[in-house]
Amino acid sequence: MASKIRRDDEVIILAGKDKGKTGKVTKVLVEDGKVFVEGINLIKKHTKPVPQLQQPGGIVEKEAPLQVSNVAIVNSATGKADRVGFRIEDGKKVRFFKSNNELI
């Protein structure tokens, strides 16, 4: 099944502590319905040092996944959140913005 939100899409956060912020999708977990967005939903992970691998311990900031329902793709023409539709053009399934029928 085709995904409405894919890697490298510009998205806006609709709910949560980062509501209203925009960022680029870095990873999509299709089975879980989650996405990772660059610089959004940062958490602090406490790690122990691993002497065998020369890894220092400490507090590491990393991105946590967001539910795909809490993000919306940003229409580059309007700069606002938009919905995505699918249609067949020249035998290929393509995505388009529902507000202005522009291809993504």
UniProtKB/Swiss-Prot annotation:
Membrane-crossing residue ranges in chain numbering: none
The entry's keywords: Ribonucleoprotein, Ribosomal protein, RNA-binding, rRNA-binding
Ribosomal protein is among the record's keywords: yes
GO molecular function terms noted in the UniProt entry: rRNA binding; structural constituent of ribosome
PROSITE patterns: RIBOSOMAL_L24
One GO location term (cellular component): ribosome
Domain of life: Bacteria
Pfam families: KOW, ribosomal_L24
Presence of keyword Ribonucleoprotein: yes
UniProt cross-references to SMART domains, sorted A to Z: KOW
GO biological process, alphabetically ordered: translation
Subunit: Part of the 50S ribosomal subunit.
Record's function text: One of two assembly initiator proteins, it binds directly to the 5'-end of the 23S rRNA, where it nucleates assembly of the 50S subunit. One of the proteins that surrounds the polypeptide exit tunnel on the outside of the subunit.
Family of this protein: Belongs to the universal ribosomal protein uL24 family.
Protein name, as recorded: Large ribosomal subunit protein uL24
